[in-house]
Structures are given as structure tokens and as C-alpha cells.
């Protein structure tokens, strides 16, 4: 698969390269493309790339010496038995002293597991050997908890050394769609499953129908993604069963903290740490209405599975593991036939629309400078009054309210009228008193002529078809 997006991340890395001494920490969940980003960055630079593995420290030093030997084209280095990391780092510092070099240590947490003192060793190497010798250091790792503890935390020996950090997230829909040769509907449905995780996307690049790709990659016992959530959680947490229970409860439609607790038959105080960890890992998101002025302390929070594939897995795979173990994949395909597009994809489409809106604003195709993009729902009744896309432009005192329709029919005036009614809620008008309201309708299937005519006469009504502003 070709390299996609990551413009901002590459800009950060190139800016750090221009510094006197850049120390960058890159972290993020597995499969998200950290190594691919690094290799794209170093492809035209003098770079030492070392991938740590689960091996003894002596073996790691021997392999690192091999990297140094091949990069410097000095075969003698691979024959030396190094016993001190400082000596290895000195080779990097001495290589082409007048040329900027990049040293990458990928899967850094494995070195810490082998030797807990490695962060202190690296701190000493950076301070005494690397920092003032034209070296840019990149530490990378997938074990988010360990990267935070050993590379970013206040009590880490490396604290204060980093000059930048990148938490790599899945690709946005707009970046993925721009690089694909797919129809909008095909792209949305694929993204609803992969969530923009590059490794997952690799398995959905064929011309075969999506349902066959799902059967082969996800539903087959031998499929790459059949047990993916197990692998992800087992690497990051010590009691995966508790985290599984939380994810299952949320996937079953329990989004309030109290409901999650009731489903698990536990006090909310007991499950809060699990939710916090799942949020840190990027598997769960805590949403609050756009009206909340202090989101972190809001009592109106709702929790959702933010990882599209994990949401798909808990909806269509986990409940049918017994049947799938017996190679009965048809039962899942029948279940998908009931609501995959109407509910599962339609839900993912809402977050896709928020991304599309942000991108259209960034490009200047919508005259709006969002300070915050989210959604809104009535504070009493979960799901009663819901606005899919809600954004605030505090600079110009404007409020954007959008409705997303993922169905085959063109959107009609009735949808606009209903959105206007929602926009007059007492809570919204009180929270954004004096703000001008701009309405937006998102559709994959276009709009009726009557609605198009109405939008032509109303500058505060914006129609977005697929990923572009609709203009008559």
C-alpha cells in the first residue's frame, strides 16, 4: 500500500531535523503506521535504524553493531563484541561528524523490558555523546503505557530531553478517500471497518466484494484479524477480561457510566480506571455535548468504542465466536445483512462527516473557523435530541449544526426543518447566546430540488454531498 497522508507529522520531523539536536518520541497503538512513517522520513537521509525485539541485551547489542556496520560500511564493527551501550552510541556520533544523522530506536519498550536501566543509559548517552554531535534521535514504541512511563513521564530519566512528541493516530477518512480508487460509498463502508488503521487497510485492497474480504480477513479462523482485539489488549493490560467486559458493555449500547456499571454489576468507581486506560489506548472515547464549558468535569459524558474495527468485532464477531469456530460464517453475514449499512456504517458516517467538515473548513470551502467540533444531545434523555455534527466558531460567534443521512434517498426539506427545531433547544440557545447558527446537511445520495433551491437562497444552509460542498 502506498504511503498516505501524515503531512503534519512529516513536517514536525523535518523541523526537528533542522534543530541543533532533536529528540522525538513517536508512540501509538500497533498497526497504526509508526514504522512506515519513520521509514518515509529517513528514506533520503543518513540514518541508523534499529528495531528492538524480545532478546537478551547482549543479542541486542550485537544486532545494533550489525546496523552500525552496514550503515557505516565498516565490516569490522560487526566483529567487535560490545558490552557498553555508550560505545555503540559513540560510533553513531563519530560517523560523518559534519553531516546530520538520524538514529531510530524502534520498539524501545523491548529494551526497557530487557534492562530496566536502559532509559538512564540512554539519558547519559544523549547528554554526553549524541546531543552535540549532529544526531537526531527518534524513540518509537507501540506499548503506549510503557512509552508514557519510560519516555514521557515526569519521573523518567529521559524527561526533559525530548524536543517533540508525536502520538500517531489512525488516518483520517479524507486522507484515505483521496488516495483510493473507490466510490464514496465503498470508501465509507471500508473505513467503517478499518478505521483508517493502515495495517488493516492492507487487507482490504483487493477488487473482491467487501463481504468476501470480511469473510477472508475477519471471520475465518485463520484470518489476520480474527483475534485482533485479544492480541491488542493482551499486550497492553494485565487483566484483559475486565477490559473486554467494558468494551462489550459499551458495544451493546451502554454509553452512560452508570449503565456500564449496571451491566457489569460493578460500582462505577471500579470501572473508571478501566475506562481511563481504554481511552489512553485509543479504543474508547469520552464524548460530552458541545454545550459543556468544562468537558473534563462534565457529568453528561457518554462513552463509545472509538476504534472502528474493535466496534465491528464486538458487534459481529464476538457474539458468534462459537459458530465461527465451527466455520459457520454465514450466521455473521446474515446478521450483517440486518443492519450493517443502516446502523453500523451510518454511525461511523457521523464521525466521517465531522472529519469532512473540518477538512472543508481548513480548505476554506466552508467559511467557518472551528474552535471545537463534536456533537450535541439533550442532557436529560440520551439519544432523544441528537445533533450529529456540532461545531463552534468562537472568534466569529457562530454555531454550526449538522445532520448526517446515510441512506439511498436524496435528503429533503423535512430533514432541514427537523434540524432547525433541534437548534432551538433551550440549552443550545442559552449556551451560545448571540451566536449565529449555520445549518449543514450531509448526504451520500444528494438532495431534492426543493432543498437545493432553498439552500441557494440561504447562506446559512450548507449542503455537503459526499466529501464536497454541493453547488447547483
Residue ranges and their predicted role:
Residues 1-334:
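Phosphate-binding site recognition
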